[in-house]
Amino acid sequence: MTSPSPRIQIISTDSAVRSPQRIQIVTDQQTGQKLQIVTAVDASGSSKQQFILTSPDGAGTGKVILASPETSSAKQLIFTTSDNLVPGRIQIVTDSASVERLLGKADVQRPQVVEYCVVCGDKASGRHYGAVSCEGCKGFFKRSVRKNLTYSCRSSQDCIINKHHRNRCQFCRLKKCLEMGMKMESVQSERKPFDVQREKPSNCAASTEKIYIRKDLRSPLIATPTFVADKDGSRQTGLLDPGMLVNIQQPLIREDGTVLLATDSKAETSQGALGTLANVVTSLANLSESLNNGDASEMQPEDQSASEITRAFDTLAKALNTTDSASPPSLADGIDASGGGSIHVISRDQSTPIIEVEGPLLSDTHVTFKLTMPSPMPEYLNVHYICESASRLLFLSMHWARSIPAFQALGQDCNTSLVRACWNELFTLGLAQCAQVMSLSTILAAIVNHLQNSIQEDKLSGDRIKQVMEHIWKLQEFCNSMAKLDIDGHEYAYLKAIVLFSPDHPGLTGTSQIEKFQEKAQMELQDYVQKTYSEDTYRLARILVRLPALRLMSSNITEELFFTGLIGNVSIDSIIPYILKMETAEYNGQITGASL
């Protein structure tokens, strides 16, 4: 008699013999393991046959299968516990599935149900994070959520995702994961390994507390933040916890509940690269963390970390090694400014050349200031995502300043000094202008909630909390006042120009020229307001009196609130020269090759 399973061949014995008739060594065709089969006749003399499977040397506990006659479906499975084959436990089963379960093997003759990954169509390994998926998509989704990675699509955000092309566009792959039902909160709630204790930067919070903001997908109203703290919260040394999770209500949410930010394809093409430098700094920070923790070997082939780091160093090298040919034009040459008035030197005193702008200081291209947020947006945002959004705003502001012909004419050294002196004011104006896009009120509410809990647990000093809370209050007041005045794009552009060309910062050279540009910006703002809002006599005065409030906000606190979670101990001042030296083509080149 031959067993129906192809894995083990069992040979029967003559039923007239009551003692073991045959001992045969067979090999499991799948595992290659050798098994000993002893064939015997049941002591009662019935036709039942007993097949004893033990190790080849006859030692150790074996499995005994007592097979009934072909007319019966009953089967007995006996586990022996001694050398004399006295059964230690007998379990009677009547269905093949139970036999398979007890034997620890599957019936290969029974057709197996094969499930396929709903994302890429590969063979699924089970249900992961709420959707049937393969190990590849499971790992990709987990890494994307755990590391809060942001991707961009080189096409129109509708790339084909299948088994063979799933690695070509990570943006569309993550988008499809969300569309097919994978839940980010399922990844966040997973238990972290106990033996992995990563050292955090000294100026970042070490707490494991999390902030959740409940969101009604059908309501555009700002949600109310609620605080959840882990039991083992550790000592906090900075303002924000890198593990803090924030759910930010976005004005545009698809009806099917998919949490994706609506993006303008043209804006993504022209401005999407502005987030590249944030990714560059993030890549360098991630590299440092990986090397410090010795976990570089854990990186998967699907991760783009290695290539991102390579591109990061290449980009920074290009910025540092910029040749003289890439420097701004000489003051003696007229700058052809498609984005503003022409620049001409009207005095050739080598010590203090005077530059005159023919035409407007700013053009319509400088009025456009559209921030593209990282997408897709995770349902629970953490500090890294907030810092990534803030860094895009900072880079957009610097890109805007660099495009002004009058700014270019001042030279690279003066450009760096000006931006270092006023980046906090430019950034704050950008926050006010993009407050709705960034859901700034919700972000600030979550931060306040987090800080309130920190002071209750004595993680931050009272004086430090007071400084930060005052800073947040000033920031919120400024943004609210600008929203109340309903400042338009032209007015924001001229206010930024007035702030940019401020001659009263310590250490500036050529202050007379800078002051001349500031006066021109003020005059053009006055002309615009009088022409556009002729009925509002005091509008210009109400706008200008808001500028002193910008000087009251600490750049150090702004840096720690919005950037420390991304760049660690790297200061904004040290990054500014690299940003100003980099060309727009380099930004776009980074984005074009960002997706693997």
UniProtKB/Swiss-Prot annotation:
It comes from Rattus norvegicus (Rat). Pfam families: Hormone_recep, zf-C4. It comes from the Eukaryota. Phosphorylation on Ser-19 and Ser-68 is an important regulator of NR2C2-mediated transcriptional activity. Phosphorylation on these residues recruits the corepressor, NRIP1, leading to transcripional repression, whereas the non-phosphorylated form preferentially recruits the coactivator, PCAF. SUPFAM superfamilies: Glucocorticoid receptor-like (DNA-binding domain) (SSF57716), Nuclear receptor ligand-binding domain (SSF48508). Residues 114-189 bind DNA. The lineage of its organism: Eukaryota, Metazoa, Chordata, Craniata, Vertebrata. The modification Phosphoserine is found at residues 19, 46, 55, 68, 98, 219. The gene is Nr2c2. This is Nuclear receptor subfamily 2 group C member 2. Its main location: nucleus. There is a cross-link at residue 192 (Glycyl lysine isopeptide (Lys-Gly) (interchain with G-Cter in SUMO2)). InterPro entries: NHR-like_dom_sf, NR2C1/2-like_DBD, NR2C1/2-like_LBD, Nucl_hrmn_rcpt_lig-bd, Nuclear_hormone_rcpt_NR2, Nuclear_hrmn_rcpt, Znf_hrmn_rcpt, Znf_NHR/GATA. The modification N6-acetyllysine is found at residue 231. Expressed in hepatocytes. Also expressed in granule cells of the hippocampus and the cerebellum. Homodimer; can bind DNA as homodimer. Heterodimer; binds DNA as a heterodimer with NR2C1 required for chromatin remodeling and for binding to promoter regions such as globin DR1 repeats. Interacts with NR2C2AP; the interaction represses selective NR2C2-mediated transcriptional activity. Interacts with PCAF; the interaction preferentially occurs on the non-phosphorylated form and induces NR2C2-mediated transactivation activity and does not require the ligand-binding domain. Interacts (MAPK-mediated phosphorylated form) with NRIP1; the interaction promotes repression of NR2C2-mediated activity. Residues 341-583 form the NR LBD domain. Gene3D superfamilies: Erythroid Transcription Factor GATA-1, subunit A (3.30.50.10), Retinoid X Receptor (1.10.565.10). One of its GO terms (cellular component) is nucleus. It is found in: Nucleus. CDD domains: NR_DBD_TR2_like, NR_LBD_TR2_like. One of its GO terms (biological process) is p38MAPK cascade. Belongs to the nuclear hormone receptor family. NR2 subfamily. Keywords: Acetylation, Activator, Differentiation, DNA-binding, Isopeptide bond, Metal-binding, Nucleus, Phosphoprotein, Receptor, Repressor, Spermatogenesis, Transcription, Transcription regulation, Ubl conjugation, Zinc, Zinc-finger. A zinc finger (NR C4-type) spans 117-137, 153-177. PANTHER family: NUCLEAR HORMONE RECEPTOR. GO terms for molecular function: DNA-binding transcription activator activity, RNA polymerase II-specific; DNA-binding transcription factor activity; nuclear receptor activity; RNA polymerase II cis-regulatory region sequence-specific DNA binding; RNA polymerase II transcription regulatory region sequence-specific DNA binding; sequence-specific DNA binding; sequence-specific double-stranded DNA binding; zinc ion binding. Orphan nuclear receptor that can act as a repressor or activator of transcription. An important repressor of nuclear receptor signaling pathways such as retinoic acid receptor, retinoid X, vitamin D3 receptor, thyroid hormone receptor and estrogen receptor pathways. May regulate gene expression during the late phase of spermatogenesis. Activates transcriptional activity of LHCG and is antagonist of PPARA-mediated transactivation.
